[in-house]
Regions:
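Short, gly/Ser/Thr-rich active-site loops of penicillin-recognizing serine hydrolases
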Residues: 150-157, 253-270
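A short acidic/glycine-rich loop-to-helix N-cap element
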Residues: 239-251
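Short amphipathic alpha-helical face segments that pack within enzyme cores
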Residues: 119-124, 251-258
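Beta-lactam-recognizing serine transpeptidase/beta-lactamase-like catalytic domain environment
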Residues: 1-239
């Protein structure tokens, strides 16, 4: 959106390990030698942590607040004010909200760490991509009915009328379709229709003990929409899994595919 890269911009991810400000960023396949040179599209297809974090650190490392401000323009950090209790609150803290913003904060934020974004906020964001850039507040109640008559309707509320430019929107929609069609999210796809979306795999912090205590737990997810060409449904699947590293594409993507195909089969108007 800031015009710094295109889908064809190339990053050399090397052997899957990249030193960053005293720490090492790794791709999931670093033990197999990594991916080498990848375009931005390919970085998202294979979920390259190295590629993603390098881009964000390279272009925003000198001004992290600009990156944070860009996220906020897309309203991904906005409370949803849902109709039911128990809503999680997003928390994305930039340099202005911290007494100390380390050099490693930005690259690790770029792959989902050091932030708190509830699944429904992520789904709302992807739904906006499917909805031509219009971000809509999720609602669980369409209308209140008494004795067969509607006594109150709950209209659709717009959170953000345009999360990004039409050019950026077209590019990211094409990439998200390739993530499923050609990338690690193939299990989320269907032979009956095209699916677009993105995988996610994150290690869950064990409270004050951080990421290194006891059994490692992972949150694997897939968020997307279908059919890609004329989106009608958006969905997120999140699974908490203990033990070895898990794959968002394989686990959550497979569940997404099964649900999507059932919905598709029941909706003859698609």
């Amino acid at each position: 959106e800031d015009g710094k890269i295109t889908p064809d911009y190339v990053v050399d991810t090397g052997n899957g390990q990249m030193p960053m400000h005293g720490r090492v960023m790794k791709d999931w396949n670093w033990r197999r030698g990594g991916y080498g040179k990848l375009t931005v599209t390919e970085i998202l297809e294979v979920s390259s942590n190295v590629g993603t974090s390098y881009i964000i650190d390279h272009f925003y490392g000198s001004n992290p607040q600009k990156y944070i401000d860009g996220l906020r323009r897309m309203s991904i950090d906005q409370p949803l004010h849902l109709q039911i209790a128990g809503e999680g609150k997003p928390n994305i803290r930039g340099p202005k909200e911290r007494s100390y913003f380390s050099k490693t904060a930005l690259p690790w934020m770029s792959i989902g760490y050091e932030t708190q974004v509830p699944p429904l906020n992520i789904l709302t964001f992807y739904n906006a991509i499917a909805n031509n850039g219009v971000s809509i507040r999720p609602k669980f109640v369409k209308a209140a009915v008494k004795d067969g008559e509607i006594v109150k309707e709950y209209p659709t509320e717009v959170i953000n009328p345009k999360i990004c430019s039409d050019k950026t929107l077209a590019q990211i929609r094409e990439i998200l379709q390739k993530v499923v069609g050609e990338g690690l999210a193939k299990p989320a796809g269907s032979k009956q229709f095209h699916v677009s979306g993105k995988t996610g795999t994150a290690q869950i912090s064990q409270g004050a003990a951080g990421y290194k205590a006891g059994v490692t737990n992972y949150l694997v997810s897939f968020c997307g929409y279908f059919p890609s060409e004329a989106p009608k449904y958006s969905m997120i699947v999140s699974i908490q899994k203990p033990g070895p590293t898990a794959s968002g594409g394989l686990m959550a993507g497979s569940v997404f595919s099964k649900i999507a195909e059932r919905v598709y089969a029941k909706d003859l108007r698609l």
